[in-house]
């Protein structure tokens, strides 16, 4: 973080990815005031989950990413991840993205590893305007 705290993102990301419809979680904090996460949804797993909650399983992914029930379920897993770390290491904010990180969109390697610098670059505007906005 900007405060000099080194945080290992792997364990936090793994807990968040235990949510049945989360495909990827990318924990961010380097040179940032607090820890945050970008979360992607697995459409195949999400659709039956939505239906099981009495929600429309056919909503567009953009709408699903902003759905209150989806957000609440992801928040449960973020909270669980935060239980195992100090306050300085905990995820304070997260954004659910409407698209996954893939090789096709250039955000994953052939060995299915997320390319952090490319993700950060692609979502820089979102991070700067929604995640790390300065309060006036």
Task: Locate each region found by the language model.
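AMP-binding/adenylate-forming catalytic core of the ANL superfamily
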Residues: 1-87, 100-104
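Conserved C-terminal "lid"/linker of ANL adenylate-forming enzymes
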Residues: 24-26, 77-136
């Amino acid at each position: 973080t900007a405060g000099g705290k080194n945080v290992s993102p792997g364990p936090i990301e793994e807990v968040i990815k235990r949510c049945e419809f989360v495909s990827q979680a990318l924990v961010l904090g380097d040179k940032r005031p607090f820890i945050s996460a970008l979360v992607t949804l697995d459409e195949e797993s999400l659709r039956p989950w939505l239906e099981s909650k009495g929600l429309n399983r056919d909503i567009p992914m953009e709408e699903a990413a902003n759905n209150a029930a989806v957000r609440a379920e992801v928040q449960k897993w973020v909270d669980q991840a935060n239980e195992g770390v100090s306050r300085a290491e905990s995820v304070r904010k997260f954004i659910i993205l409407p698209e996954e990180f893939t090789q096709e969109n250039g955000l994953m390697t052939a060995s299915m590893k997320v390319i952090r610098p490319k993700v950060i670059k692609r979502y820089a505007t979102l991070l700067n305007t929604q995640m790390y906005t300065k309060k006036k």
